[in-house]
Amino acid sequence: MINLILLGLPGAGKGTASEQIVDKYHLAHISTGDMFREAMANKTPVGLEAKSYIDKGDLVPDEVTAKLVEERLGQDDVKNGFILDGFPRTTNQAELLDEITTRLNKQLTNVIAIDVKEETLIDRLSARFMCKNCGATYNKFSKKPKVEGTCDRCGGHEFYQREDDKPEVVKNRLEVNEKMNAPLKEYYDKKGLLATVNGEQVPEKVFADIDAILSKD
């Protein structure tokens, strides 16, 4: 069984790699963003608790997010393994996750960091654009829609660039993320769980390297 966390700065290619891993290994793809939306829509107790913070514009405390993760990891589709997306972001969250996975007997098997140089990430992120309708992500260099001007996923025709994908904002965002990412890598390296792949390569090669790590274990 594979229970996996992918680490990497924005633009490193975690989304693409996650899709490829899920397709091959049939893991549950657990995204904290999706979890929040689902729990709030279903009005679960934890969802309502999270909503009370979000509605006030406050950050959701780690303990509340951890409850949400525990609720999600207890669902049936996780029995073949999971890939966690967006959690943990800090060592405090990593410690909470250790407690959860121990309680549920679903310990992590792999933590894979996708490493990419800062200048490459700035180029990638400032070339990124999204479908206004469904949020599918594209890149004007490496991942254009199959039909120009038409979203592959939903057929929409309107696209936009996020404010935080503009070059002047990207550099600052990367620095903030790196400050959070570095201690996490160290945390999992000390536990002997961390492997690193070169994210400068084409997505197929990045996935081949990840696949080699996952197949080995």
UniProtKB/Swiss-Prot annotation:
Q: Which GO terms describe its molecular function?
A: adenylate kinase activity; ATP binding; zinc ion binding
Q: In which pathway does it act?
A: Purine metabolism; AMP biosynthesis via salvage pathway; AMP from ADP: step 1/1
- GO terms (BP aspect): AMP salvage
Identify the residues that bind AMP.
T32, R37, D58, L59, V60, G86, F87, P88, R89, Q93, R162, R173
UniProt xrefs under CDD domains: ADK
Show the Pfam families listed in the entry: ADK, ADK_lid
Its subcellular locations are: Cytoplasm
Specify where the region named NMP lies, as residue ranges: 31-60
PROSITE patterns associated with the record: ADENYLATE_KINASE (PS00113)
Record's keyword terms, sorted: ATP-binding, Cytoplasm, Kinase, Metal-binding, Nucleotide biosynthesis, Nucleotide-binding, Transferase, Zinc
Looking at the record, which segments are called LID?
127-165
State the similarity comment: Belongs to the adenylate kinase family.
Q: What role does it play?
A: Catalyzes the reversible transfer of the terminal phosphate group between ATP and AMP. Plays an important role in cellular energy homeostasis and in adenine nucleotide metabolism.
The protein's matches in PANTHER family, at most eight in alphabetical order, are given as: NUCLEOTIDE KINASE
Please state what the protein is called: Adenylate kinase
Tell me what organism the protein belongs to.
Lactobacillus delbrueckii subsp. bulgaricus (strain ATCC 11842 / DSM 20081 / BCRC 10696 / JCM 1002 / NBRC 13953 / NCIMB 11778 / NCTC 12712 / WDCM 00102 / Lb 14)
Q: Give the encoding gene's name.
A: adk
